[in-house]
From Swiss-Prot:
Family (UniProt): Belongs to the methyltransferase superfamily. tRNA (adenine-N(6)-)-methyltransferase family.
Predominant location: cytoplasm
Taxonomic placement: Bacteria, Pseudomonadati, Bacteroidota, Flavobacteriia, Flavobacteriales
HAMAP family the UniProt entry points to: tRNA_methyltr_YfiC (MF_01872)
A single Gene Ontology CC term: cytoplasm
GO molecular function term, any single one: nucleic acid binding
Function: Specifically methylates the adenine in position 37 of tRNA(1)(Val) (anticodon cmo5UAC).
Keyword Cell wall biogenesis/degradation: no
Organism: Flavobacterium johnsoniae (strain ATCC 17061 / DSM 2064 / JCM 8514 / BCRC 14874 / CCUG 350202 / NBRC 14942 / NCIMB 11054 / UW101)
Protein name, entry field: tRNA1(Val) (adenine(37)-N6)-methyltransferase
Length: 235
């Protein structure tokens, strides 16, 4: 069990454990527009939806999870939280969910399962299966185009090396970057992740910055502490 300041996350049933990526997106996703409705695509344990329930007054927070174990875990975590009445998890894939869109969302978030090269084995078939498990970015962008409200925002965390590709895809659907934060583990390490926020409205100046997580092992930067202090017990 992973204990945060206002809620806890059980993760015993699922392979999708609480990780830095989810916490980053849940803390970082822009909510300045006071979203009424939020959708979390690929919820895993439900961590991002839970963080957004804490950060906003959104009355409708929907999460989508295709994996049965993860879905059951997310439901359990939602029900145990202080915001159970605002959180709902659908057991469905994105393609199925967008077939009959009923609602528009002011904020759509996704920490998509991506294919990381670190996982390469010598078993080509297994690699291929893993590659197909990754959620195609096209699906996320297409869903956002379909489901975002007029002033809605799409926020994702993806590998830095995929940033240009994702941004180009979003542009095809007339979704434009408004904020980009590039994440490094330590001051000397390479940029690993990109936090990206898109809107239907193009901005003249994109807000771009960099976030370093640790100065040294388990010594967090003031910026990372500031971003996550409402959640982590020891921050």
């Amino acid at each position: 069990m992973f204990q945060f300041k206002q809620f806890s996350v059980k993760q015993d049933k699922t392979a999708m454990k609480v990780g830095t990526d989810g916490v980053l997106l849940g803390s970082w996703a822009p909510v300045f527009h006071n979203p009424f409705s939020i959708l979390d695509i690929g919820a895993g344990t439900g961590i991002i939806a839970l963080m957004l329930a804490q950060r906003t007054h959104a009355e409708q927070i929907d999460a989508l999870e295709i994996d049965e174990d993860a879905y059951e875990q997310a439901v359990e975590n939602f029900e145990a939280s202080p915001w159970g009445d605002r959180l709902f998890c659908f057991h469905a894939g994105l393609d199925e969910f967008i077939e009959e869109p009923e609602d528009e969302y002011d904020l759509i978030v996704s920490n998509p399962p991506f294919y990381a090269e670190d996982y390469k084995t010598n078993d080509e078939q297994r690699d291929l299966a893993r590659f197909q498990d990754a959620m195609p970015f096209e699906e996320i962008v297409e869903a956002a185009d379909l489901l975002l409200s007029e002033n809605g925002i799409l926020a994702v965390i993806i590998p830095f090396k995929e940033e240009a590709k994702f941004t180009a895809l979003a542009k095809d659907f007339e979704l434009y970057p408004i904020k980009i934060t590039r994440v490094k583990g330590t001051p000397k390490s390479e940029i690993k992740r990109s936090l990206l926020a898109f809107s239907r409205n193009e901005v003249s100046e994109i807000e771009i910055d960099e976030l370093v997580i640790e100065i040294d092992r388990h010594i967090y930067t003031p910026e990372y502490i500031d971003l996550t202090k409402e959640f982590y017990l020891k921050m």
